[in-house]
């Protein structure tokens, strides 16, 4: 590993990991070229500078996917058990948060996007195996919920007033697993006919994908159409993929698997990925429902086990 902050990082690892300052990268590549004249690079993962530099010092560059990515995709029994246990704990935190949110809304207490985000964090951090968030929480109310990758700041922070939608997309890193969940909650008691219709269509897509059975030759792009079907009947859609891979106490976005319009992913038992259809009406509201799925065998076919344990 080469990084400018190597002194701060190296103290957290043992001698099995070589960490050096970034300025040593060129020398290391030159030393490598003395005894090695060919190298495999993953074009999706390798910075162009490294490829360019290797070619200039006489190394033959060939291309192949990093084999480590495929080994990570198939979770073993310990990792699967950890995922299930971490989702039980995470689900309890989500339920406590939803109970707190509903109770305080009924009492007309002032709750902002930032307050809600911090409260959810506080519930999660009480878990002994909690190690931090898996990504920065998306906590958006009303118009802010229509921004797919919204990040609340002091300047954009909105109060959760009655009669609009609140979307929170959040996840945690536990020592035994990683979580990623999105829920969309109506604040108040008078959702519009349109909001009820769109929410139902998003929910149908989520549930139908979760319950779908398919053979091993089905691609990610084929499953993607299931999540979009009920929205497309109304001639609307969402501008992102339906799902991404999830690492085991690693990156919450783990490639190369996905469920999206161009995905050529083939699925195998033990893979873990998200299911997150949505709809976003610009500057008005956003709806997304996200669960994590485990690929399993069902009736000589493949299917999904929903790991996320929280009410929709």
Question: Where are the language model's segments positioned?
Answer:
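Active-site neighborhoods and metal-handling regions in enzymes and metal-associated proteins
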Residues: 1-312
């Amino acid at each position: 590993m080469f990084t400018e902050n190597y002194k701060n990082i190296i103290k957290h690892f043992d001698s099995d990991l070589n960490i050096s300052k970034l300025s040593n990268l060129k020398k290391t590549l030159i030393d490598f070229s003395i005894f090695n004249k060919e190298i495999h690079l993953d074009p999706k993962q390798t910075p162009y500078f490294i490829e360019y530099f290797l070619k200039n010092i006489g190394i033959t560059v060939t291309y192949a996917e990093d084999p480590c990515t495929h080994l990570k995709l198939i979770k073993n029994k310990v990792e699967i058990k950890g995922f299930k246990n971490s989702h039980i704990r995470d689900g309890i935190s989500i339920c406590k948060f939803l109970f707190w949110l509903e109770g305080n809304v009924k009492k007309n207490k002032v709750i902002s996007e930032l307050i809600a985000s911090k409260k959810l964090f506080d519930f999660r951090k009480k878990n002994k195996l909690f190690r931090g968030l898996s990504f920065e929480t998306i906590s958006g109310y009303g118009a802010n919920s229509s921004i797919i990758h919204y990040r609340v700041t002091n300047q954009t922070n909105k109060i959760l007033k009655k009669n609009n939608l609140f979307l929170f997309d959040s996840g945690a890193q536990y020592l035994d697993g990683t979580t990623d969940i999105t829920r969309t909650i109506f604040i108040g008691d008078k959702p519009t006919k349109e909001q009820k219709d769109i929410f139902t269509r998003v929910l149908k897509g989520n549930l139908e994908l979760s319950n779908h059975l398919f053979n091993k030759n089905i691609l990610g792009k084929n499953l993607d159409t299931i999540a979009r079907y009920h929205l497309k009947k109304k001639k609307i859609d969402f501008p992102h993929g339906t799902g991404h891979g999830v690492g085991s106490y690693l990156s919450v976005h783990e490639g190369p698997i996905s469920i999206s319009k161009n995905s050529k992913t083939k699925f195998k038992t033990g893979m873990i990925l998200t299911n997150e259809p949505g709809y976003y009406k610009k500057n008005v509201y956003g709806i997304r429902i996200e669960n994590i799925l485990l690929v399993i065998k069902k009736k000589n076919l493949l299917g999904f086990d929903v790991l996320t344990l929280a009410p929709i």
